[in-house]
Amino acid sequence: LPLTELQVAYYAIEKNFGDKFVDSFKEIMEALRMANFNLNDASKLLHVHKNTLIYRLDKIRETLNVDPLGNNNDREFVNGFYYYLKRKEQIYQV
């Protein structure tokens, strides 16, 4: 997808799923990225049990219909959404 279309999609996701989902998504994605998408390491960074992280990740999978651990295209999509949210956060100091 072209960048402008992705930005429209990211904006729609952010607005339709609300702050609670977005905050949880950012927290999980930050930990997964820091842990190179290793669930054990990410769960330690989040100070939660691995099964709790899996449960939260399943909620993201169901909501966005993506599998960032099993599909590289989906991983790129969620990484893009994460960068979109972080960039917006920096611009608006939200």
Segments predicted by a language model, with ranges:
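Cytosolic nucleotide-utilizing catalytic cores of signal-transduction proteins
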Residues: 1-94
